[in-house]
Amino acid sequence: MEVTFQFDWSAAFGSIPHLLPGIPWTLLISFGGLAIGFFIGIFFGLLRISPLRWLRWPAIVYVEVFRGTPILVQVLFIFYGLPQLLGSPINALVAGIAAIAVNSGAYISEIVRGGVQSIERGQSEASLSLGLSRTQAFRYVIWPQAFRRMIPALGNQGIISIKDTSLFSVIGVGELVRQGQIYIATTFTALEVYFMVALMYLAITWTLSILLRQLERRGLAGQ
Amino acid sequence: MNDTTQPIVRMQQLNKHFGSLHVLNNIDLDIVPGEVVVIIGASGSGKSTLIRCINGLEEFQSGNLVVDSSELLPYGKSTQALQKIRTEVGMVFQQFNLFPHLSVLDNVTLAPMKVRGLSRDDAISSGKRLLDRVGIADQADKYPSHLSGGQQQRVALARALAMEPRLMLFDEPTSALDPEMIGEVLDAMRELAKEGMTMVIVTHEMGFAREVADRVIFIHKGEIAEQGPPEKLFDTPQHERTQSFLARVLKH
């Protein structure tokens, strides 16, 4: 039997209108999840560097649990597992956003911790010596510097989370991969369609990279 | 007792340990308003730790410490007193510790606005006056990293003075500077001393100490080994440790 590998460009281009509806879902899940994850990350990242041990350990447990388990298991747990506890089903979109939030939150809390700890002790000493409270020192001196140092790592996490949303095709949320699968089921053009799906992810992540580079350059210009 | 004789710093039987290391050993020290005290001693003798206790950047384990009529307690247990003391006591650090994300002017106006509650306009006008006084008025809009070390340290001085402190602490203010920039910082400090500021200075600049100090304190292994007016301490040191320390540092 003869097998021919032929890339059918018309099939590839023809899939575009069927894939495009997935993009808003992919963006909504990733950016919605990341926005929440950012606040989770700040919260646990700051707990993690608290001088009080009983504030530190919940943060350590959180990071270990959500960084140490696969995001696919996390979303399956939320979508199929939690409803058994709650007694009511969870919307697939909500489950996806929640999974990105708790997962990226764990990584972001480590980014926050590292960023804040990277600021020299002299900065807080100078602030305190001027009479600023610890909170003021953090808000006006430590955090703005720490945040600038965190930008590259946060961008990295953003890109990872965008790609992670592809796993959520398993819970039926209509993101990019899911749209591709649905289309392939009728056309059997897996090669062309997945190629286009990959290109669309690349378009999203590449745009984000460019924006981040500009943000970084602007952030550094001040110093 | 009136205000001029009441000491602004009163340290009695102060002790500090880092683990098993006894860093400060029964320190007794009174500083009166207007006095310029220079603390000298070998590195690791505890002189920096001593002045960092005065504004609570270091905790101590036992003894009494009253700064500007607020009492600091052992183990840093007195947040309110600490806050009050820090608004009245300025500090200049060896590494400048300017805020790199803020312009020179914003470095100087931050604390007066956030701590003293000055309006932005008032903070800016007094900030500019202070920058002018230390000779950096034309650099107000630059960021610290664009300034030389000597300029940065003068900004740090202006930043501390912007809080209108009653006491200034200097922790080796010229030790991180290139030799050619030491003079400009010492000049600014000399000026401040002339205006009557109470100053406690940890330094290795013996010539400056002799010229500016009302009193020189020699610290050895966490204890005040000897103190007195600069002529006396530098020319006729009594303690054998003082003699050998001075012989070492004055040789070059």
Describe the residue ranges of each PLM region.
Chain B
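C-terminal boundary and immediately downstream tail of ABC-type ATPase nucleotide-binding domains
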Residues: 220, 227, 231-252
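Pre-NBD coupling/linker segments of ABC/ABC-like ATPases
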Residues: 2-3, 242
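ABC family nucleotide-binding domain
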Residues: 6-230
